[in-house]
């Protein structure tokens, strides 16, 4: 366990530097709270859990700061950062003088509308972005009438969403252990499952990549050049491109656990691919086909192709592999060029599945080596992001175990999870949210309002997906 008597420096990898220095990875956990509960006591236990977690994962309590080298940063954890004071107490109940206009009862009845939970008052992030020292974690306990909204987000520079899932599993375990009634139970649990090994925090395997890698040796740049000769599918949008963010919609849908399995089996049967097609392949293919059909005209005689951007995890494909609980960045956005209107959902699923063969140790080492050779990658971060050029982005959180986390005491399992940050661009996105304890998955679909209306009327979509009206 780390000492709190000296400053600790966490060196960052080229992949860490490639990620945006923003709090794009963020969730709001939502619980009902009895009116008899002492909210100061709940905050105290959350803080104790965070304090213990920072002792085990020191970079979590630190700040991303410049190193003095152009475009280079590190994480600096000061002695005072180990006390859990990153967690902000925010009383938004009636009579607090700072009340939030929505009670827990009302937001639950309205099915926890996504737009409510991106309110600036629920998060300290906006204020943090003006600082030179950016805290790794943004944590705020918002007590509303009858409930708690716990905001937790992290700088993408520090870790990816898989690492964040691992960190929050440890945090929830530590919060649970802080309640007096939970102490004995926690001792009897298999705490080995939550022990932070040194290898989980070791970023050295990702510090150096392949040597002498030029820009056009990297798959994304080669793909960008090849695709520059294709017609842009956005020339065939059914409706004109949106000119205001108000023309976009955050639509919410749900797919049941049973439908997920049936979807995979149905698509697999089209091509006798039962043995290898995954549920995530099938779901991504369905989303690609249906969202494109809702947005892009199918009347053109030309073959239209465009990029689906998905995130793949490098932990298991690296040689040697990283620990599954590695707590840095190893996941990368990965563009896959597909037919905009494939002949079948199976055809799209097959192409998505086969694309993973290109996401391998060499691919990741080439990117690391290329970035490492640049020195200052500030401009390259922008150039690299442009290579993704997505027609659709899928950020799949389905397999994250957020709903399985028991926070103990007055909290227990969260009642709901909602994304903490609003979308602020016009890039269509689908976010399969963490599976609930019954296996059902909410899908957040960010597209033009006109396209969302057509998506709700799509027969193929409606065969598997149910709209959730907030």
From Swiss-Prot:
It holds the Pfam family TRI-like_N. One of its GO terms (molecular function) is acyltransferase activity, transferring groups other than amino-acyl groups. Gene3D superfamilies: Chloramphenicol acetyltransferase-like domain (3.30.559.10). It comes from the Eukaryota. It is an enzyme of class 2 (transferase). Pathway: Polyketide biosynthesis. Its EC number is 2.3.1.-. Induction: Expression of the botcinic acid clusters genes BOA1-13 and BOA17 is coregulated by BCG1 during both in vitro and in planta growth. InterPro entries: CAT-like_dom_sf, Plant_Fungal_Acyltransferase, Tri101-like_N. The active site is at residue 156. The keyword Transferase applies. Keywords: Acyltransferase, Transferase, Virulence. The keyword Transferase applies. Belongs to the plant acyltransferase family. Acyltransferase; part of the gene cluster B that mediates the biosynthesis of botcinic acid and its botcinin derivatives, acetate-derived polyketides that contribute to virulence when combined with the sesquiterpene botrydial. Botcinic acid and its derivatives have been shown to induce chlorosis and necrosis during host plant infection, but also have antifungal activities. Two polyketide synthases, BOA6 and BOA9, are involved in the biosynthesis of botcinins. This is Acyltransferase BOA11. It comes from Botryotinia fuckeliana (strain B05.10). The gene is BOA11.
């Amino acid at each position: 366990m780390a000492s709190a008597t000296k400053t600790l420096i966490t060196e960052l990898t080229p992949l860490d530097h490639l990620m945006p220095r923003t709090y794009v990875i963020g969730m709001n956990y939502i619980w009902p709270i009895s009116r008899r509960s002492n909210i100061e006591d709940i905050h105290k236990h959350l803080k104790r859990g965070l304090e213990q977690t920072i002792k085990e994962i020191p970079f979590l309590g630190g700040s991303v700061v410049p190193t003095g080298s152009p475009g280079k940063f590190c994480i600096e954890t000061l002695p005072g950062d180990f006390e859990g004071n990153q967690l902000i107490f925010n009383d938004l109940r009636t009579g607090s003088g700072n009340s939030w206009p929505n009670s827990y009862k009302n937001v639950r009845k309205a099915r926890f509308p996504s737009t409510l939970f991106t309110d600036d008052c629920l998060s300290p992030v906006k204020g943090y972005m003006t600082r030179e020292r950016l805290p790794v974690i943004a944590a705020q306990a918002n007590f509303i009438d009858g409930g708690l909204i716990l905001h937790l987000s992290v700088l993408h520079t520090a870790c990816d969403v898989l690492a964040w899932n691992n960190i929050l599993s440890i945090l929830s375990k530590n919060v649970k252990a802080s309640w007096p009634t939970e102490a004995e139970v926690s001792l009897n649990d298999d705490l080995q499952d939550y022990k932070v090994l040194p290898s989980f925090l070791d970023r050295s395997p990702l510090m150096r990549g392949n040597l002498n890698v030029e820009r056009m040796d990297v798959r994304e740049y080669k793909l960008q050049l090849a695709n520059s000769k294709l017609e842009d599918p956005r020339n065939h949008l059914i409706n004109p491109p949106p000119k205001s963010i108000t023309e976009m919609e955050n639509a919410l849908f749900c797919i049941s656990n049973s439908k997920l399995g049936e979807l995979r089996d149905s698509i697999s049967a089209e091509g006798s691919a039962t043995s290898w097609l995954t549920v995530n392949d099938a779901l991504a293919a369905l989303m690609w086909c249906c969202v494109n059909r809702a947005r892009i005209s199918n009347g053109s005689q030309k073959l239209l192709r465009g990029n689906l951007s998905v995130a793949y995890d490098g932990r298991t494909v690296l040689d040697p592999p990283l620990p599954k609980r590695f707590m840095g960045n190893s996941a990368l956005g990965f563009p896959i060029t597909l037919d905009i209107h494939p002949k079948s959902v199976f055809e799209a699923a097959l192409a998505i599945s086969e694309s993973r063969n290109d996401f391998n140790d060499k691919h990741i080492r080439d990117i690391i080596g290329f970035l490492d050779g640049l020195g200052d990658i500030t401009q390259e971060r922008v150039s690299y992001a442009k290579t993704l050029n997505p027609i659709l982005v899928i950020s799949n959180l389905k397999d994250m175990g957020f709903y399985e986390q028991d926070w103990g005491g007055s909290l227990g399992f969260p009642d709901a999870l909602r994304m903490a940050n609003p979308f602020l661009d016009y890039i269509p996105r689908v976010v399969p949210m963490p599976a609930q304890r019954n296996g059902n998955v909410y899908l957040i679909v960010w597209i033009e309002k006109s396209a969302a209306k057509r998506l709700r009327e799509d027969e193929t979509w409606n065969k598997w997906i149910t709209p959730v009206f907030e």
